[in-house]
Amino acid sequence: ILYNKDTDYYYLFLSFGGLDASGGYNIRVARSKNSDGPYEDASGNAMIDAKGEAGSFFDDEAIKDYGTKLIGNFAITNEQDIPVGGYVSPGHNSAYYDEVEDKYYIIFHARFPNKGEQNEVRVHQLFFNSDGWPVVAPLRYAGESLAALETEDIAGDYRFYKMDNAIDSEYEEELALTLTATHLVYGQGGGYWKSSELPNESSLVLNFTEYKGYFIKQWDEVNGVETTTFSGMSAEGKALFGIKKTED
């Protein structure tokens, strides 16, 4: 459980699913004004109701629609559609606030596309949007901080990933989208992007759904360069990642 003084909410971070490569491990969150609850997700579901029938055990189907999913399986592919990054079964998490840096982090272990049960610990930065929900920076932490970005930093071709509620071994769907300097979005979906309510916050509207979050300058370790990412969440609690392409 993590308290945020700015939102005045307590956040309950959870892992759903099984931790092996086929278990569909994923990280979710719920919040409450009181440390002892009751906790609800972004859809208003009470987390105390997240359970299977009496006598059941590991009933993923019964609980899959509880908890706001922050991150699950996703594969970053290259131009030949070969996975070169991303995570499989990220979970077993801890959320942490660094008072000195005034930054929030989430620490978890993860497996990787096409690498079986090999696993490592990862640290990603957390940000809170104007709806009071945390969003996870799509790439591992490398010292980045939020800052105002120029239009040319944001515009470009992206890979986007929409998190669904499934608890399975499938990857989240990858969408190829282009963000233009005139704030339009097109490709495997359409919409626009704009500034939002909080400092440095942005909204990306995709197929009539608004995702509030942040464009972030992050280190792309696969290609060894800095790139722009986006992490946002809809009012219904659907998380969206975007990673700007950097390869030639």
Feature map (PLM): residue ranges:
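Carbohydrate-active catalytic/glycan-binding domains of CAZyme proteins
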Residues: 1-248
